[in-house]
From Swiss-Prot:
GO terms for biological process: Gram-negative-bacterium-type cell outer membrane assembly; lipopolysaccharide transport. Belongs to the LptD family. One of its GO terms (cellular component) is transporter complex. It comes from the Bacteria. The gene is lptD. Component of the lipopolysaccharide transport and assembly complex. Interacts with LptE and LptA. This is LPS-assembly protein LptD. Keywords: Cell outer membrane, Membrane, Signal.
Amino acid sequence: MEHKRNNILLAGLFFLLLGLVSIARAQIPQWEKCGAFVEPASEELLDPEPRGPVNVEADRVESEKNGVSVFSGEVKFRRRGQWLDADEVLYDKPNDTVEAFGDVRYQDATMDVISDSAKVNLEADIGEAENARYFLRDYHARGEAGAVEREGSVKTELRDATFTTCDIGDNAWQLKADRVSLDHKEGVGWARGARLRLWDTTVFYVPFLRFPIDNRRKSGFLVPSGGSSSNSGIGISTPYYWNIAPNMDATITPRYLSDRGPMMEGEVRYLNPSNFGRIRGSFLPHDAKRDDYRGAFSYRHSGSPRPRWFTNLDLNLVSDDRYFEDFGNSLSIASTTVLNNSLDIGYQGNGWNALGRFQGFQTIDRSIPAFARPYQRLPQFLVDGFFPDRFLGLDVDFHGEVVRFDRDAAPPTGGVRLDFWPTVSLPFRTPGTFFTPSIGVRDTRYFLEDAPPGTDSTLSRTLPIVSMDTGAIFERSLTLWGSDLRQTLEPRAYYLYVPFEDQSAFPVFDSAPLDFYFSRLFQPNRFTGADRLNDANQLTLAVTTRLLQSDTGAELLRASIGQIQFFRDRRVTMPGAAKETDSSSLVIAEVAARLAREWSLRGELRFDPHKKQTDLGAAELHYRGDEGGLLNINYRFRRNFLEQLNVSGRYPIADNWSVVGRWYQSIADGRLLELLGGVEYDSCCWAIRLVGRSYITNIEGDRNNSVLVQLELKGLGNLGQNVERLLERSVLGYGQPF
C-alpha cells in the first residue's frame, strides 16, 4: 500500500513539474522531414538593421494632402531589411508611418507575418498587425495571433497566440497562450497562461513557460523524464541545463527513485582553443535498498597548453562494486571490473614523441585477489621515434621506457623497469615489390623492491631481434557483373629471429600473450609489455587479394590468409605455462566485402590445423538502406570461452513508422544477454518511441527489466526517458544520417 501511494505521489509530482518547466535548448533539432514555411530570405532581408531609402511599387498611386500617399494594387514596399506587401498601403511621409490593408505580408531578417492589416512606424521601427499568422526564419516554427506587436528586430509581442514547429496543416502539438513574448536577440520565447495541446486536446496548463525560438543553446529546465525498472522502481528526473558560456555548459539533474530515494546527477562540459573536458558525477546520500551511500565521479580532460605539448587526464571513482550494476544502462558498463585513473603529459617532436604518465586503478570487483590486480605506474616515461631515410638510406626506430610499478599486495611487490629498443632497417622498394631487413637490440633491466629472500633484486636481459620483411603486388584487369575491376594478389613473407634467454625469474608487471589476429603475424613479439620477449626462429607466409573499381579505386573486396612456420619450440612463456611445440601457428583468415551499396560483410577465422578445429570465428553483416532500414548480424565464437549472436536492426513499416530491436544471445550457455524491442513514429515535428528492454546486470545472471516511453515534441522538448540515446548504443547505425 505504501509503495502504491509513493507511485501516485511520484506521478503527481511529475505533472506538477511539467507545469513549472522552462524549456532549455541543449541540442539542435533536425527538420529534414519538414517542408519549408517560407522561401529563403534574400540578401536584403538578412540585414538585421533596417536603413536606407524607401522604394515602392504599385499599380496605382494617389497623392493626398498633408503628405499622405495611397498605393493600391499589388503594392511592394521595400527598404533594406524590411519588406511589406499588401493590396493597399497608406504612406504618411512626414510621420514616416505606413498602414497596410488586405493580404498584408511583412518580412524581415527574423520572421514573416501575414495579416489582414498592419501599421508600421518606420522611424521608430515598431509595428502591429491584426489576425496574423507568423513564421520564424531561424527556427522551423509558426503560429497564429490575434494581434502582433513588433519592436524592431529585437522583440515581438503576441496576444491570443499559438506556437508549433509542425508543418502547415498539421497541429500534432501546439502551445496556445494568452500572451507570448519573442526575444529575437536572446533567441527565447516567453508564454503566459499557456496550454499544451496534442491533437487539438489540451493535456496540461502551464502558467509560465520559456521556450527556444532559434538553434542557440538556452539555460533552463529540460522537460522532466520518468520511467520504471525492476531494479530501482519508478523514477523521475528534472534536468536543468545551464548554458554557462559559449564554450561551457552544465546539466544538473535531481532524480528520485521510488525504491532507492533521492539522487543528484551532474555533468559539466567545456571547450577552449587549447583544451576540452567533461566532468560527471552522481550522488545518492542513502540507498534504501542497500542502506548506504552510493556515488560515482569521472573527469576527462585533453589539452594542448603549448605548441607540440599535450595533456590527458582521466579520473574515475565509484563508491562500491555494485554501482554500475544498479545504475549502469548497458551490459558492458555493468560488467566493468577496473577503473582507470591516469595523467599524461607529452611532447610531439619531428618524428619523435615523449610521454610522462602517472597511472593507478580502482579495482571494483573485490573478488579479484590482490596479486592479480593491475600494477600502478608511478611514474612512467616513454620516448618513441622514427627517423626514415637516414645515413645510407637507413630507417631508424627507437623505443624507450622508464617506469616504476607498485601494487598493494601481500607481500608487497614492485620496482623500476628500464626498457630500450633501437632498430635500424634498410628498405628496398620498387613499384611492385619491397624488401626490408631489420636488426634491433632490446635491453631490459629491473631494480626490484622488496624482493623475496634468496632472489636477485637486479635483473637484466639484452637480446638481438633480426627480421626480414618482403612482398610483391601483382595486378590484373577483369570484368565481373558488368563492372570493370582490378584484382591484386599480394604475397608477403616475414622472417623473425630472436635467441632464447631464460626469463622465468623476471616479474610480470604488464605482460600478457597477445591475442592472435592477422596483423600479429608480422610483429616481433607475441607478448604485450616488456616483461617477456619471445624466442623466435620463424617464417610468416601470407597472401592478400583485393578487388578494386577501375575508375574510382574503391575497394570492393579484401581477403587475407596467413600462417607462421616455426623452426624450433617456443620456450619463453608466462608463469605456469608450458612451452609451445607446434611446428606451425593457427591459420588466420580475414575478409571484408562491400556486397552492394547497402550491404557490407566482415569475417575472421582462426583455424587450428593440428587439432583440425576452429579456434575462433567472427562474422559481421551490415545493411543500411536509403529509407532508414538497418540490419546488423554479429556472430562471435571462441572455443571453450564464448559463442554469441547479436542481431539488431530498424525496419520501416510505413510512412514515419519503424520497428526496432536487438537480440543478444549467449549460445554457449543458452543465456539471453539482452532483449530489446520497440516501435517508433518519427515525423516532422514530433516523435514517439516505445521500447521494452531486459538485460543481465552481473555474472550471477540478475536481470533488469524496463519499459521506456519517449514523446519528442521537436523544438520544445522530450517527455519520458531518453530512448533515442539507448537505441544509438544498442543498434549500430541508429541516429546516423542516411
